[in-house]
Amino acid sequence: MNSLSIFFIVVATAAVCLLFIQGYSIYENYGNIKEFNATHAAFEYSKSIGGTPALDRRVQDVNDTISDVKQKWRCVAYPGNGFVSASIFGFQAEVGPNNTRSIRKFNTMAQCIDFTFSDVINIDIYNPCVAPNINNVECQFLKSVL
């Protein structure tokens, strides 16, 4: 064996030893790792200290690029009529004849979530808080859920 092959054997042995040491370290601290992950799981997709939002890129939805809480879309119970999708922009709307807009209502929370966070690109929005209807019941409800 020449000196070059001995050098490579020593480097390979050191690399394998480092892998074993790392594996043993994880094995010894596995309980602490699980406790840390359980404690901080609620912050998994929250905004980081550095100012860059940590996004879940596995599933794309309408809230991925929004950091203001009031702008995020959410499904809320509508008084007496199921559920609606709301944000500071207004409610998701149904467009009727003569381009009239009304609040899109859903029978179940699951239907609301499926529609709100689906891949629908063209979403009609109805904001009851624009003039002249600033003090109507729908506007008061929108302000109360934000």
Curated annotation (Swiss-Prot):
Record keywords: Disulfide bond, Fusion of virus membrane with host membrane, Late protein, Membrane, Phosphoprotein, Signal-anchor, Transmembrane, Transmembrane helix, Viral penetration into host cytoplasm, Virion, Virus entry into host cell
Chief subcellular location: virion
Membrane-crossing segments per the record: 1-21
Membrane topology of the entry: Single-pass type III membrane protein
Record keyword Transmembrane present: yes
Subcellular location, record wording: Virion membrane
Gene Ontology biological-process annotations: membrane fusion involved in viral entry into host cell; symbiont entry into host cell
InterPro entries: Poxvirus_A28
GO cellular component terms given for this protein: membrane; viral envelope; virion membrane
Parts of the chain on the Intravirion side: 22-146
PTM annotation, UniProt: Contains two intramolecular disulfide bonds. They are created by the viral disulfide bond formation pathway, a poxvirus-specific pathway that operates on the cytoplasmic side of the MV membranes.
Pfam families, per database record: Pox_A28
Assembly, per entry: Part of a stable entry-fusion complex (EFC) which is at least composed of proteins OPG143, OPG147, OPG155, OPG086, OPG094, OPG107, OPG104, and OPG099. Formation of the viral membrane is necessary for the assembly of the complex. Interacts directly with protein OPG107.
Family, per entry: Belongs to the orthopoxvirus OPG155 protein family.
Function: Envelope protein required for virus entry into host cell and for cell-cell fusion (syncytium formation).
Protein name: Envelope protein OPG155
